[in-house]
């Protein structure tokens, strides 16, 4: 990305899901996620997103999906993590107690804000099919965060891309009345429930900040992949057809696939060469 910046490359938006802190070992030197402390992880992430900001258009946005992590909790937990494919697990700093929720998403969000990003919104990714957890002293985790950040105070958002289907409620510009619903403005003949005939009814509304998106496995991927349905509203709201979408943690290539399906271009980075076949398949499928 540093080379792209010196060459004058500019992207309209970045949508990405980086490796989570202490979750798994991808088996590659220089990987992010196995730093010894949360602070080291956050510092590494801030540096990555400085590079992103250098290639981001002045009116561009960053859509960042990030999950949280729990403290080790002792040898038993570390053994379970090792069985899931992790060779090593960062040691917990002294200020974190066993079983503590670390708070990685907000640590990162605040660090990025302190580094100059505008922190515009926290979006809740609600998972209706969360990963089962064998816990009895807390709820099963069924959400992650998507943070919307911008490079500048004013930035591009497509209002239509920020819409979602309206669900229930009263039609637009109506209010409850004793005899039903009254239309608050417009022609007088439309101001009673009997003559309303759905005048002003809204088919869409401004998207809410809780997005329900099921996780979906992808054939050939060893770990969880970024759901296309989570990426799609980000790309539609944050870019125009023909714009370039960046994913610095490309993984299996979901961001590239969704970008191409909606007439955007893409740029991506990925440390693990094992993902190359998956990326090629997804990109080829999007171009058909």
State each model region's role.
Residues 1-288:
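Core catalytic lobe of class I
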């Amino acid at each position: 990305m540093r080379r792209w910046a010196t060459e004058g490359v500019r992207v309209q938006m970045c949508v990405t899901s980086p490796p989570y802190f202490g979750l798994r070992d991808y088996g590659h030197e220089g990987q992010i996620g196995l730093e010894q402390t949360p602070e080291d992880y956050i510092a590494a992430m801030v540096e990555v997103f400085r590079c992103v900001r250098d290639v981001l258009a002045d009116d561009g946005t960053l859509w960042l999906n990030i999950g949280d992590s729990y403290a080790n909790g002792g040898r038993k937990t570390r053994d379970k993590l090792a069985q899931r494919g992790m060779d090593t697990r960062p040691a917990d700093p002294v200020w974190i107690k066993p079983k503590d929720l670390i708070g990685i998403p907000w640590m990162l969000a605040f660090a990025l804000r302190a580094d100059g990003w505008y922190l515009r919104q926290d979006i809740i990714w609600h998972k209706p099919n969360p990963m089962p957890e064998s816990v009895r002293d807390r709820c099963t985790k069924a959400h992650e965060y998507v943070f919307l950040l911008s490079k500048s105070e004013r930035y591009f958002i497509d209002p239509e891309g920020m819409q979602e289907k309206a669900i229930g409620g009263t039609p637009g510009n109506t209010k409850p009345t004793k005899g039903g619903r009254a239309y608050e403005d417009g022609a007088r003949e439309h101001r009673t429930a009997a003559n309303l005939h759905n005048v002003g009814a809204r088919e869409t509304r401004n998207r809410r900040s809780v997005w329900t998106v099921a996780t979906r496995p992808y054939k050939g991927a060893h770990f969880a992949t970024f759901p296309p349905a989570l990426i799609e509203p980000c790309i539609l709201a944050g870019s125009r057809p023909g714009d370039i979408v960046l994913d610095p943690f490309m993984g299996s290539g979901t961001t590239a696939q969704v970008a191409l399906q909606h007439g955007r271009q893409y740029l991506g980075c990925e440390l693990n060469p094992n993902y190359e076949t998956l990326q090629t398949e997804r990109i080829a499928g999007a171009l058909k």
